[in-house]
Swiss-Prot record:
GO MF annotations, alphabetized: ATP binding; DNA binding; DNA negative supercoiling activity
Residue ranges occupied by any Topo IIA-type catalytic domain in the UniProt entry: 32-497
UniProt miscellaneous comment: Few gyrases are as efficient as E.coli at forming negative supercoils. Not all organisms have 2 type II topoisomerases; in organisms with a single type II topoisomerase this enzyme also has to decatenate newly replicated chromosomes.
Organism: Streptococcus pneumoniae serotype 4 (strain ATCC BAA-334 / TIGR4)
HAMAP family according to UniProt: GyrA
Catalysed reactions, as listed in the record: ATP-dependent breakage, passage and rejoining of double-stranded DNA
Sections of the chain in a coiled coil: none
Primary role: A type II topoisomerase that negatively supercoils closed circular double-stranded (ds) DNA in an ATP-dependent manner to modulate DNA topology and maintain chromosomes in an underwound state. Negative supercoiling favors strand separation, and DNA replication, transcription, recombination and repair, all of which involve strand separation. Also able to catalyze the interconversion of other topological isomers of dsDNA rings, including catenanes and knotted rings. Type II topoisomerases break and join 2 DNA strands simultaneously in an ATP-dependent manner.
Keyword Isomerase assigned: yes
Pfam families recorded: DNA_gyraseA_C, DNA_topoisoIV
Protein name: DNA gyrase subunit A
Main location: cytoplasm
One Gene Ontology term from the biological process aspect of the record: DNA topological change
Enzyme nomenclature, EC number: 5.6.2.2
Length: 822
């Protein structure tokens, strides 16, 4: 038999209904602040309860347990711990920009220490908290019954300053959360006044007076673009960074000193995190971490090793610890009983409307009170003007009611006026008292007229709001604590975590690449080429050697006309004897694609620097280095190649320089680079040399009159010729003879300019390699055949050669070379 007290319900429907009720209760009545006073219900009840207890700044502190118990018993039946924790936060300087509670005792620390139990601590309202409740007894806000209908509590506080922005808010509701940063009081008040003076004001205009958040712990806000977006939309993110300085000790060592941490960061946890990073060797160069903070302020010291870079360590700390954090704006608040994400302008507008209502209701209350008092005084003045008749009526009456009725009938008085006459003391019958009553009455009439004028003129209401805000600003405003750094700051890149140093990049003929310390080789100018390679196989040699920096960019040009970009630190570091890493592991090269040239692009490269391209079919192109500033990971097309053409060489040309191009049939053309106009990256180029049928380009170099032109033929002949024998002519000619081509010496294998004191590395198509000094190669005329440089096996041909600078063995290690026949 079913119990009549049981009701069958659908579980799904009940869960939906109950959860919605619960969610709305949490959202509206617990977790989110009201846009008008910036308070959640618990904070509002704490302040109102303290005000009712009389725990004001001019009174002694009262036990926190007494305050908590009173608030819980009358207004907030949710447990004393939640009430006490909320009150503690309002008393912490690192949590609230302007504390609303003045705590006495242990109220915790920014290291995460908990406050003492509520039975040990004491509290009272702070001075600025009084401004939140000012005029609350003048019917400025609505009151409702408390949870048991035995008390009345305010729905919102008058809030004579914009507390939602000034102290911010954080809270997690059901399915939504709020995160509003604190701001400087003076700046926020200026923003309120700006909106009142100019309703058409933009977010950009507002940021002139309210540039951004002002956190109680100070620190730095990196960039303003995130602030503007958050103010415009209610959502956004900013980067907060610790305020640091690098000190140098008497012994010459460096130390990092942190004086301000980002908002809500626990510096004890930061300390523990740094120690853990050092132990795990994720950060190197730190010898000690100390927290020297005291009552004077925060001082967090990080000692740095003598040979370590404090700036690099600091950048690592910013990236790996909470010394740099993101603050996410989510300006969600209750407006008209509904949770909404609000822009800065909407928050200011809501506050202004609230203040207008407060001022109007207060003015109306004062006017009604003044009118009631004037009404009484008017009756007293009538009585004083007819005092003898009044006394006669009173004496003749047997009861108070009879006297009151007679007075009302005789002098046309109201019940309240007649009662006031009956209550009047005899001493007020004197002439002096009559003058006082008349003066008070006249003042009240003037006040009533003024209050009526305020109610009739909205502009006067606005002016009162601004005047009262100015008074709050005068009393409580202070200097900004958080510094706003101009310009947007991106997240820390890898190079910020790597110390800049000079290095050497080597690329072998077989495509092995590595990075070495500069000390591994003899010193060269950055961008230079040509020390011998080490650590390569017997059939390999270093074809490209570039002196650069770990922070500089390297451009890799391939035979297919594509370009790739790496920074110096992105190339793995190897020892001098290691062969390195195949370059295909770093660059996404096609199977038949190979690196032709490596160019160092220094960070301080001049604006007139150009890259000069030469293809096998004689096409040339000149393009500004700046065109290659942004290159994707999978490379970029450096020039358009046609008809199975391929890129031979890329030269870095600055200023007024000549170019020489050599062809397979033994011809060369020299012209000034200015003969080729600057072109875009995707351009095809123009004709640099007019090739004969079957001829191709085999080499191109920059040339000056102090250089020598080196040519090597496929059958092992070579020569050096002074550059002055190659006059500068126009672009696109067939060229002048640079070698006497015969069946004996073969076609040209290559052409390049040299200084004359380098070593020459030559390699054949069978893998045989020889190294010889250029002094062993005769200097002859332009149209000669040259001398035998390398004796080849039958059917073998020279395929490539390059120069390397001469270096002593003790500086570079053992040479790797395979001699050909003499």
């Amino acid at each position: 038999m079913q119990d009549k007290n049981l009701v069958n319900v659908n579980l799904t429907k009940e869960m939906k209904a109950s959860f919605i009720d619960y969610a709305m209760s949490v959202i509206v009545a617990r977790a989110l602040p009201d846009v008008r006073d910036g308070l959640k219900p618990v904070h509002r009840r704490i302040l109102y309860g303290m005000n009712e207890l009389g725990v004001t700044p001019d009174k002694p502190h009262k036990k926190s347990a007494r305050i908590t118990g009173d608030v819980m018993g009358k207004y907030h039946p949710h447990g004393d711990s939640s009430i006490y924790e909320a009150m503690v936060r309002m008393a912490q300087w690192w949590s609230y920009r302007y504390m609303l509670v003045d705590g006495h005792g242990n109220f915790g620390s920014m290291d995460g220490d908990s406050a003492a139990a509520q039975r040990y601590t004491e509290a009272r309202m702070s001075k600025i908290a009084l401004e939140m409740l000012r005029d609350i007894n003048k019917n400025t806000v609505d009151f409702v019954d408390n949870y048991d209908a035995n008390e009345r509590e305010p729905l919102v506080l008058p809030a004579r300053f914009p507390n939602l922005l000034v102290n911010g808010a954080t809270g997690i509701a059901v399915g939504m959360a709020t995160n509003i940063p604190p701001h400087n009081l003076g700046e926020t008040i200026d923003a309120v006044k700006l909106v009142m003076d100019n309703p058409e004001v933009t977010t950009k205009d507002l940021m002139e007076v309210l540039p951004g958040p002002d956190f109680p712990t100070g620190a730095l806000v990196m960039g303003k673009s995130g602030i503007h977006k958050a103010y415009e939309t209610g959502k956004g993110s900013i980067v907060l960074r610790s305020r640091t300085e690098i000190e140098t000790t008497k012994t010459g060592r460096e130390r990092i000193v942190v004086t301000e941490f980002p908002y809500m960061v626990n510096k004890t946890k930061v300390h523990e995190h740094i120690v853990r990073l050092v132990q795990e060797k994720r950060i190197e160069g730190i010898t000690a971490v100390r927290d020297e903070s005291n009552r004077e302020g925060v001082r967090f010291v990080i000692e740095v090793k003598r040979d370590a870079s404090a700036n690099v360590i600091l950048n690592n700390l910013f990236k790996m610890t909470q010394m740099q954090t993101n603050f996410g704006f989510n300006m969600l608040a209750i407006q008209n009983g509904i949770p909404k994400i609000l822009s800065l302008r909407q928050i200011l507008d809501a506050y202004i409307e609230h203040q207008k209502e407060v001022v109007v209701r207060r003015t109306r209350f004062d006017k009604e009170k003044a009118e009631a008092r004037a009404h009484i005084l008017e009756g007293l003045l009538i009585a004083l003007d007819h005092i003898d008749e009044v006394i006669r009526i009173i004496r003749a009456s047997e009861t108070d009611a009879e006297a009151q009725a007679e007075l009302m009938s005789k002098f046309k008085l109201s019940e309240r006026q007649s009662q006031a006459i009956l209550d009047m003391r005899l001493r007020r019958l004197t002439g002096l008292e009559r003058d006082k009553i008349q003066s008070e009455y006249d003042d009240l009439l003037a006040l009533i007229a003024d209050l009526a004028d305020i109610l009739a003129k909205p502009e006067r209401v606005s002016q009162i709001i601004k005047d009262e805000l100015d008074e709050v600003k005068r009393k409580f405003s202070d200097k900004r604590r958080t510094e706003l750094m101009i310009g947007q700051v991106l997240s820390l890149e890898d190079e910020d975590l790597i110390e800049e140093s000079d290095v050497l990049i080597t690329l072998s003929n077989r495509g092995y690449i590595k990075r070495l310390d500069q000390d591994e080789f003899t010193a060269q100018k950055r961008g230079g080429r040509g020390v011998q390679g080490t650590g390569v196989k017997d059939d390999d040699f270093v074809r490209e050697l570039v002196s650069t920096s770990t922070h500089d960019h390297l451009l890799f040009f391939t035979n297919k006309g594509r370009v790739y970009r790496l920074k110096g630190y992105e190339i793995p570091e190897y020892g001098r004897t290691a062969k390195g890493l195949p370059v295909v592991n770093l660059l996404k090269l096609d199977e038949d694609e190979s690196i032709q040239t490596v160019i160092n692009v220094e960070s301080d490269r001049s604006d007139d620097a150009y890259l000069f391209f030469t293809t096998r079919h004689g096409i040339v192109k000149r393009t500004s280095v700046k065109e290659f500033a942004n290159i994707r990971q999978n490379g970029l097309k450096a020039l358009n190649l046609k008809d199975e053409d391929e890129l031979i060489n890329v030269l870095l040309a600055e200023g007024d320089m000549d170019i020489i191009i050599g062809t397979k049939f033994g011809y060369a053309v020299r012209f000034n680079q200015s003969a080729v106009r600057g072109m875009s990256r995707i351009a095809t180029g123009v004709k640099g040399v007019n090739l004969r049928e079957g001829d191709t380009v085999v080499g191109a170099s920059l040339i000056t009159d102090q250089d020598e032109v080196l040519i090597i033929t496929e059958k092992g002949y070579g020569k050096r010729t002074v550059a002055t024998e190659y006059p500068t002519k126009g672009r696109g000619g067939k060229g002048m003879q640079t070698a006497k081509i015969t069946e004996k010496n073969g076609l040209l294998a290559g052409l390049m300019t040299v200084q004359g004191d380098e070593d020459l590395m030559i390699i054949t198509d069978t893998g045989v390699m020889i190294r010889t000094n250029l002094a062993n190669i005769s200097q002859t005329g332009r149209a000669t055949m040259g001398v035998k440089v390398m004796r080849l096996d039958q059917d073998a041909q020279i395929v490539t050669f390059t120069t390397v600078a001469v270096a002593e063995k003790e500086e570079v290690g053992t040479e790797n070379e395979t001699e050909g026949e003499a």
